[in-house]
Amino acid sequence: MGGLRVDLSGAEIRVDPACGAAADDGGSPPVFLPRQPAAPPLLALDIGGTLIKLVYTASCGGGGAELRFAKFERRRMQECFDFVRAQGLVHRNGSTMGSSKENIALKASGGGAYKYTEDFREKLGVCLDKVDEMDSVVSGANFLLQSVPGAAFTHMNGKKSSVDISPNNLFPYLLVNIGSGVSILKVTGNRKFERVTGTHIGGGTMFGLAKLLTGCKSYDEFLQLSQKGDNFVLDLIVKDICGELVCQKQGLSTSTLASSFGKVITSKKKLTDYRPEDLASTLLSAFTYNIAQISFLVASILHLRRVFFGGSYIRGHKSTMQNISYAIDFWSQSKMQAVFLQHEGYLGALGALMSYGDSGDKNMNLEEMKEEENIHESATPIDETSTDEHNDGNIFPYLLVNIGSGVSMIEVTGNGKFERIIGSHLGGGTILGLARLLTGCSSYDEFLELSQRGNNLAVDLTVGDIYGEHGYPKIGLPASTTAASFGKVSSSRLSEYKVEDLAAALLNSFTYNIGQIAYFVANLSGLKRIFFRGAYICGHEKTMDKISHSLKYWSKGQVQTTFLCHEGFLGTLGAFWSYENMGIDGLAAHEVIREVLLGAPYTGQLPSLPLTHQQDNGEDTTIEGEVERLRHDNAVLKAELERLQRENTELKAKLVKSGKPNTFYH
């Protein structure tokens, strides 16, 4: 197949297939190629961590050909082999590929192209000509955007609108590819791109947790469940914390999300007491908003206005696209636009198909790949500063990250000068809420003890699991790197997994996520120092260790990480700082301003997610909401009191022993 090419001129999407055959993947209509000459079929594959995606050509009787699409779960690889044979894709010039002395090569991208070479050779008699995954994804996206009218669209307020893309102003753009994990690439031209970052909280995380929480067997089943659910059953919103009067006084929307799964921590319900539909809805909103937030921050750092989303975990799902679109629009104040693609799950396979006929192609070997940095260098690099430079004269400006049920990030520029600039709904409430559902633990301390004895690699999918022992060196990802938190979960039976391993995976995924977002916010604001505080972090060395490691990785050691414990005790410096000389005494003292410390990542309510359960019950719901708020406040205050008592005892013991202030882990 190596000498054949695909003629893309005049390509168009046809809802009614020109060749009289429907798409093998009902959500991905064929692309008609009117000028493609009659020829044996071409087949290309993208073998990912979860799915095998196929793109192949089929000649049309009246001239031209179609690009057709099909996908299979990787664990059902035999079904893929059977399909390839049934469609006649293993024949060339009337003979079976495997019947010749030399095996025919199929273009293939993705980590599975390296791991399953022998399977394809044995079952189909073909060898896999490996194409770099990121090259393929970018090539596939550029093909759709440049050659296929109507391939790009937006989805806002339930309305899908086609986007006209001019090849003259396409570049640069940000491409967010949502697979088992998420890769974020800056594309500056044809075959010109850079993988700037990624996150291990992606489609594999959603699906893995969905299996454990809802018992669903497929991702499509999970999406169907989410459509029927209500995330407000489990999510903590601003009204639950502040009450309606404070919300009205401060001009806050009562439905502003503060903490995903945050209501679970004060509830006596067990996992079996929640509806699978509500659990699915909460999972979907939690992780789609998180992906959108990271995408917004990266686009802001790179000064990009247009963000394209692709990947097999979007699947044209309306709520997924709506959540991402709403969050991007809100954070950017309508200056950025989330754009989606037809055939978004087939970018890698399309790119591999485009590589047929490339004279410069060679079969890639992971061991020979050139390593390069996978983190984009900021336009305003953050200089490393020694920790001994902290004093009254140079402490400002800094980023204060408060980790409560949600996460709030505040820029402090001087004494009494601070502003909440962003937050995250994936905070301590999310960690403990999910921990209670998955492990049955009753407290954060118990959860941390479980995590100490667990192994996150029992459920987390690593780069090595996808690419093999050499990892993905071209973009600087060693085999040990987590590719998708909970991405290795294959069973829907929670009892098959150790609670210790689940706890370890939870702690890893969310603490690294908090660290990553904090780094991006500091980078965007040009801040060199980050102070962390909050009941879910202070005094917990395991949590501080994870966040410190995350910041060190993302910033390459150029951002200072300090933890405030017990009214501003900076243990990392062996010095005592009060909120007053940090310039935030007003923030700590005035109850009316406590909404600044909420972790809400956005404000307002999506039209597609009405407060049905709150609106239908009238006054009774208001009373129930107040009771729920009081229960939550009581639980938080009780936990805070226990923490302070424990810290006080430990501090006294260490002061007696050392004769100097305690030093916490940095």
UniProtKB/Swiss-Prot annotation:
Among its keywords, does the record have tRNA processing? no
Does this UniProt record's set of keywords contain Transmembrane helix? no
Where does this protein act, in terms of pathway?
Cofactor biosynthesis; coenzyme A biosynthesis; CoA from (R)-pantothenate: step 1/5
Q: Which InterPro entries match?
A: ATPase_NBD (IPR043129), Type_II_PanK (IPR004567)
Gene Ontology biological-process entries: coenzyme A biosynthetic process
Q: Which UniProt keywords apply?
A: ATP-binding, Coenzyme A biosynthesis, Kinase, Nucleotide-binding, Transferase
Q: Which domain of life is it from?
A: Eukaryota
For this protein, the activity regulation entry reads: Regulated by feedback inhibition by malonyl-CoA.
Q: Which GO terms describe its molecular function?
A: ATP binding; pantothenate kinase activity
EC no.? Answer: 2.7.1.33
The terms describing its cellular component in GO are: cytosol; nucleus
Q: Which reaction does it catalyse?
A: (R)-pantothenate + ATP = (R)-4'-phosphopantothenate + ADP + H(+)
Q: Which family does it belong to?
A: Belongs to the type II pantothenate kinase family.
Q: What does this protein do?
A: Catalyzes the phosphorylation of pantothenate the first step in CoA biosynthesis. May play a role in the physiological regulation of the intracellular CoA concentration.
Protein name according to UniProt: Pantothenate kinase 1
User: Which organism encodes this protein?
Assistant: Oryza sativa subsp. japonica (Rice)
